[in-house]
């Protein structure tokens, strides 16, 4: 399977496959430990593991599963996504609502709101780059 964005996202969009992927990233376990920790049936386990390996995210080395270099990068990206969802989702929704209300905010007001709500410079940079 070619590692396209759609294939990678499809592979880790399954909750059980993502749990398996995250467990491998944290512990480098063997098969029995993975099945126990993720509470998957053997069939579910092998099906998800096959997808993770075909996508180039996971490899088996000396009887243990580990992330590939590509898998480590994808793991870091998915952790960033999780952090943005957990910490910034509602703040970003609030910023969107200010932009819609009363014809929007001036650039100065927008920057003030952004500085107040968002402490992550990378997120601020992304938002500011897309202001029309």
Model-predicted regions and their roles:
Residues 91-132:
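Exposed, interaction-prone assembly regions rather than primary DNA-binding/catalytic cores
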Residues 34, 45-55:
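Basic amphipathic alpha-helical segments that dock to polyanions
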Residues 53-64:
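A short, conserved structural fragment
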Residues 69-99:
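Conserved segment of winged-helix/HTH DNA-binding domains
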Residues 1-19, 106, 113-114:
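Short alpha-helical segments that sit at the start of domains
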Residues 18-22, 73:
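Pre-recognition alpha-helix immediately N-terminal to the DNA-recognition helix
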Residues 15, 26-30:
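Short capping segments at the starts of secondary-structure elements
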Residues 31-37:
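A short acidic, leucine-rich amphipathic alpha-helix
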């Amino acid at each position: 399977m070619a590692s396209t964005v759609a294939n990678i996202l499809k592979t880790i969009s399954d909750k059980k496959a993502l749990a398996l992927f995250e467990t491998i990233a944290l512990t480098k376990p063997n098969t029995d430990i993975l099945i126990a920790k993720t509470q998957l049936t053997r069939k579910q386990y092998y099906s998800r593991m096959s997808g993770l390996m075909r996508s180039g995210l996971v490899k088996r080395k000396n009887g243990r599963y580990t992330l590939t270099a590509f898998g480590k990068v994808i793991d870091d990206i998915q952790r960033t996504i999780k952090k943005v969802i957990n910490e910034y989702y509602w703040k970003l929704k609030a910023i969107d609502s200010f932009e819609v209300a009363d014809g929007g905010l001036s650039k100065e007001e927008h920057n003030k709101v952004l500085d107040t709500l968002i402490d992550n410079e990378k997120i601020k940079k992304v938002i500011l780059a897309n202001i029309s």
